[in-house]
């Protein structure tokens, strides 16, 4: 239940600087979530605020809820926010201006995401570096290369007509944002990066983090399998840059995380046991090449963490940057869980618990550097 977040969410949405007669805010609630529904009844009535009750049948996913809300919307733009989000008050205005300037080739602009509790513990600091690197470097790089952009799950601003024409969200995909970004690219549309920040709650609990990240990994594999069903067609639609992006970012992210622990274990075994079976299966040259990759790869990722901390002007994140290998261990656990759930519960939406932060949620974050 998101009951504790509901009143705060509405308060933050009320800070959005946009003409009220042009706003149509819809709170999407599960029909059988009686606790949150009762909390919603206590909200002060507003002409621009409505509640949509999503039927409690399978699939019980966020994209299904988004589709229900989208069916009743009439605006020219459609924006998605999560329950814990604190968007820049000028974000809607910035999105409208950006879409008008970019032209009809653009279907969506993605705002940057940051955290309002990034200093809570080591895990939230890792998460801040993770997001900081993605939204400040990787995402703009993909846009500049003309590669498909795996969208984030929140603060996406869509042209409603394009969203409708491309089929909106896949209700069975648990990373509907990444899937939609690929479908938009295949349909010939572009995605831009909006210079505006939405801050949200960084996951501060390791078990909760693994649940969330495993859902992301599972959804990435789903997305890859769906789009790779017709290789010749998808190659023609995406081009070589798009195919590289599909393989490296969509398939490669969960795959490398899953293999990471396996290769670490092999490395430790080779150095400690000197088992002849291992030596026969993996000759020394293979291990020496692997060691080069291990050293250079780790140095590159550590450098990226330090670079991101400096870019964000967050010296308090430097220690977390040097401890990133421990973060990868969590990623490995999440990837293993994702592989298991991909077989046993492919469309199960494992919800992330929110409200675990000790910091007060800011009412009015502004545009600028991701924090």
Feature annotation, model-predicted:
Residues 181-199:
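Catalytic donor-sugar/metal-binding loop of nucleotide-sugar-dependent glycosyltransferases
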Residues 14-57, 100:
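Acidic donor-binding segment of Leloir-type glycosyltransferases
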Residues 129-136, 211-231, 296-304, 337-339:
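Catalytic core of nucleotide-sugar-dependent glycosyltransferases
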Residues 174-180:
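Acidic donor-binding loop at a coil-to-helix junction in glycosyltransferase catalytic cores
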Residues 245-343:
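Membrane-embedded multi-pass helical conduit in multi-pass membrane proteins
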Residues 42-76, 89-174, 214-225:
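Long helical/loop segments within the catalytic core of UDP-sugar-dependent glycosyltransferases
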Residues 82-86, 172, 184:
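The conserved acidic donor/metal-binding loop of glycosyltransferases
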Residues 2-15, 35:
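Short, well-formed alpha-helical segments that are part of the catalytic scaffolds
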